[in-house]
Amino acid sequence: MSKLLDRFRYFKQKGETFADGHGQVMHSNRDWEDSYRQRWQFDKIVRSTHGVNCTGSCSWKIYVKNGLVTWEIQQTDYPRTRPDLPNHEPRGCPRGASYSWYLYSANRLKYPLIRKRLIELWREALKQHSDPVLAWASIMNDPQKCLSYKQVRGRGGFIRSNWQELNQLIAAANVWTIKTYGPDRVAGFSPIPAMSMVSYAAGTRYLSLLGGTCLSFYDWYCDLPPASPMTWGEQTDVPESADWYNSSYIIAWGSNVPQTRTPDAHFFTEVRYKGTKTIAITPDYSEVAKLCDQWLAPKQGTDSALAMAMGHVILKEFHLDNPSDYFINYCRRYSDMPMLVMLEPRDDGSYVPGRMIRASDLVDGLGESNNPQWKTVAVNTAGELVVPNGSIGFRWGEKGKWNLESIAAGTETELSLTLLGQHDAVAGVAFPYFGGIENPHFRSVKHNPVLVRQLPVKNLTLVDGNTCPVVSVYDLVLANYGLDRGLEDENSAKDYAEIKPYTPAWGEQITGVPRQYIETIAREFADTAHKTHGRSMIILGAGVNHWYHMDMNYRGMINMLIFCGCVGQSGGGWAHYVGQEKLRPQTGWLPLAFALDWNRPPRQMNSTSFFYNHSSQWRYEKVSAQELLSPLADASKYSGHLIDFNVRAERMGWLPSAPQLGRNPLGIKAEADKAGLSPTEFTAQALKSGDLRMACEQPDSSSNHPRNLFVWRSNLLGSSGKGHEYMQKYLLGTESGIQGEELGASDGIKPEEVEWQTAAIEGKLDLLVTLDFRMSSTCLFSDIVLPTATWYEKDDMNTSDMHPFIHPLSAAVDPAWESRSDWEIYKGIAKAFSQVCVGHLGKETDVVLQPLLHDSPAELSQPCEVLDWRKGECDLIPGKTAPNIVAVERDYPATYERFTSLGPLMDKLGNGGKGISWNTQDEIDFLGKLNYTKRDGPAQGRPLIDTAIDASEVILALAPETNGHVAVKAWQALGEITGREHTHLALHKEDEKIRFRDIQAQPRKIISSPTWSGLESDHVSYNAGYTNVHELIPWRTLSGRQQLYQDHPWMRAFGESLVAYRPPIDTRSVSEMRQIPPNGFPEKALNFLTPHQKWGIHSTYSENLLMLTLSRGGPIVWISETDARELTIVDNDWVEVFNANGALTARAVVSQRVPPGMTMMYHAQERIMNIPGSEVTGMRGGIHNSVTRVCPKPTHMIGGYAQLAWGFNYYGTVGSNRDEFIMIRKMKNVNWLDDEGRDQVQEAKK
């Protein structure tokens, strides 16, 4: 029947009505509804998440139709919270909601790709050599062939290949490199395993079976806050976001919660309905400032000054004038403030704080015979010297006393915070002051660089009969903050209005924040903590941690929290959120990831030192150690270049090294056999005699640099790679935009410990292999690009510090085109390696140098002074004064069999983490039944790890966080050390065993584990330090308590034994730049900041069409209206940003939210989107890291000293970048460098 007439308004009858005429029956055509129904039809829904470093860890419904992913929406079935707490869902953000666009976009990598010039060389070599290893050798031994493909990296030229061909090439390159130079010349970089832990483990397991180098990430990203290890002996442990709701006062300090913590921001707003006050502290008017009750805008880089001014108020009002019993008792028990510190005399009659008194300093060691040099001393309220339980000396070599019970020598005791009232004299003690250092871009307040303040002291007779004055840390802290104690101290402040360090008036001068605001907020923060017993919280972010002196910023805030008894209390404490660092089932994951089931120890390296060295950034270093030293230090003992300090640290075992030795470690066994020595003895003797050198001492030797590099789950050259242009030149051997001069040309400070060569090696990497699902900046510079499965096409697991759940990535559809999951890719490479290595590598003995690790007895190395064996100051003792030297047996032809099975070391040595261990036989037996076992071959009878799900089951079975039986064993193991019963924390979950299919059904809350410092409970939200405070488990520090005083000799020499305001450093990136020709527009030097962006998670999503549409469609730089007027820049103009490190081009965003003197380029905007050429370099503009360069800090190199000991991603040099300054100007000519003859150069109008 025709419906033609129905389409006309007037040629139809009125339809039947109903509901008293309010409704009408219609007979119109409804065929249009079918298209709507078809659009939203689906065949299935699969749970997955996004393996991106955002900390969100959000569970999503993935809709599949006809074998294709059509869209995604948020899951809403998280386990419910207790009645007084909001639920977690829905969790998600616009970036995550756009991810399905990637799967079928033009950006998707579909096939294995290789650089055309390289594959032509490879195919030609295979025609001449039937052995792939010899074929690769023929290319490597011809400099012209190497140069031919290295110099065109980053300039296109990829062609499609196949998996078999490329696996063979990669394996041959690895075999030749290992055979010729050593396995530590093969390295891999991948970040943040928590976001897809099996994918991470795939690459590091392969590398570890080879003996390759696994590079760290948390320190390199500058997500690692060194202040956390310094204070707590913990990498980072923080409250889950739900605990914000338990807080009564929150300061969001440099953390842009709604923008970078979108899924969690609802807790931040919901808690305000309870009356919680929220404060934003950011230099720019950011998203978080709009959410808060009050906004403070300190000058960027002056956060420690503001924190110390607030600390001054807290100490004066709540510790001295009107002491809070809660604060005093908390500090007495849970901080190092009662501990005694030696005073060392100065020539002028004053003293300088030295190291902490140890039991070994006193007669008979105060009755302590086990590690007395590592046990700190205090005075109790009766005036007696005591050795309180809990210091690091109780942790190793004895059991039952490593706890925070108020006991010393088996007797109840109460420690004294201050010596005032028990003192023998009052002495002048000198403190360094850095706030007077002049910098044209930052405010300073002139004072004597040495401030002498009066302290109460007690005189002790030491074991050698000498008398030594001592002070308590508490008295040192009060003096350091400039508080008047009634001791006739002219340098202390009598009231807040005095402009003396570190009063509110002084803070106003430095930060620009009015002192009345400093006083009010500090008072409110402390008063709330006093009334609620610690429910005041500080949420911190990358904005504060990315400065060179980030540890001073953080220690200032941490001190506020400790003064107020907030750490370890629900709703209180330190909440640092930068990076999805919390891999909750960590101890179950470690054996899988680093092949600890087959070989121990693995080779691990801190990336900051690695890239600083091997991208030759040290050759351009203009910052000297001398300018960083305290005015109280003996400068003659701390001479040299910054890389010298890194080399000394590696030599003494403080830091790892890669490559490690100046020759192939696989050849040492043969030399040792000839000498009749073990490999360990031979290596130690050869190092001591100088016959064998460490590779770090000769970085430009042809055999002492990395040659093969794997990058996966990362955009190293488009996101985290500080010193981008240096990487291009020295690692890759391609064109770069460096505008500075090497030290050789500029007559700068040359290294003392490192051999200087006039010509540095360019193009150190023979092979760069990148795994990704999209064409990223790193892919553009790679030799081989392998297409990985997306997060909706593979099985994996994901956890975060923001919530207590573990949930999966699931293969909703098969990997598209020829992509494969990371596990399958590395399994394929391992199989090719096992085939190719035959005849070249067999069963080999590898000599591995292992640094003095935190959470091991090696953290008790040199207790009182720093002695260097190379200088003859002590003997070379592996594991004590030098790295531990370990001979590791490798079976290279069995690499594939070992990769796909769980090795026997788990049965023999068990498992553990953070200094405790337990038996795992039950779990190994279970995995053999669950995953089945190898039927034959070198791994016969071992549990299979064939698939990613098998790997997930290994993690879940071995981890106390996901296996209640293991959790009980872990708590028992800890209880043997502490002498306390802790199993009650997990007994009720003993029968709970989480499997992969369980988390696919619903996210599961993990089980409380002793390797973390909070509890997973239905009664309390996860809060870091909770078990330390409530279970009396010591912090893993020298004193066993929260460590405010850092007494290592290097910390004291660099003026950082106590917190101090240190202004941003002068990197000289502008002043030491080559002469850049003017372009007719004005130029200005501005501070260059790189906060996290709104339209991407790092570089992911930054080239996603949906996000580009919502943003400006390409790279942008924010500047203030004031600076823009001065530079004749208007909004959306093309500008160029440049300094000695390189140049970048972007559009300007002119905004009143940005203060004058700074510019912001949101971090990791991909260089592949809408970037014209640079007028400075003549090349296409760079990325945000084109104008940065790494500058390591010596105090981050300390090791073998309790909490100041290296651990993978735990402590070490960090890649800061916010002290950089750049020149900015409007571009005159915008040239797109299309080279097609049709492009027009756009000329700007003046």
From Swiss-Prot:
Keywords: 4Fe-4S, Cell membrane, Electron transport, Iron, Iron-sulfur, Membrane, Metal-binding, Molybdenum, Nitrate assimilation, Oxidoreductase, Transport
Enzyme class: oxidoreductase
Domain 4Fe-4S Mo/W bis-MGD-type: start-end pairs: 43-107
Cofactor binding annotation: Binds 1 [4Fe-4S] cluster per subunit.
Binding site for [4Fe-4S] cluster: H50, C54, C58, C93
TM spans (from-to): none
Catalysis: reaction(s): nitrate + a quinol = a quinone + nitrite + H2O
Residues reported in the UniProt entry to bind Mo-bis(molybdopterin guanine dinucleotide): D223
Record's bilayer topology term: Peripheral membrane protein
A Gene Ontology BP annotation from the UniProt entry: nitrate assimilation
Record GO terms (molecular function): 4 iron, 4 sulfur cluster binding; metal ion binding; molybdopterin cofactor binding; nitrate reductase (quinone) activity; nitrate reductase activity
E.C. numbers: 1.7.5.1
Cofactor(s) listed in the protein's UniProt record: [4Fe-4S] cluster; Mo-bis(molybdopterin guanine dinucleotide)
CC terms in the record's Gene Ontology section: membrane; nitrate reductase complex; plasma membrane
Coiled-coil residue windows: none
Cell compartment(s), UniProt: Cell membrane
Family: Belongs to the prokaryotic molybdopterin-containing oxidoreductase family.
Primary role: This is a second nitrate reductase enzyme which can substitute for the NRA enzyme and allows E.coli to use nitrate as an electron acceptor during anaerobic growth. The alpha chain is the actual site of nitrate reduction.
Self-association state and partner proteins as the record states: Tetramer composed of an alpha, a beta and 2 gamma chains. Alpha and beta are catalytic chains; gamma chain is involved in binding the enzyme complex to the cytoplasmic membrane.
UniProt-listed NCBIfam families: narG
Designated name of the protein: Respiratory nitrate reductase 2 alpha chain
Organism: Escherichia coli (strain K12)
Lineage: Bacteria, Pseudomonadati, Pseudomonadota, Gammaproteobacteria, Enterobacterales
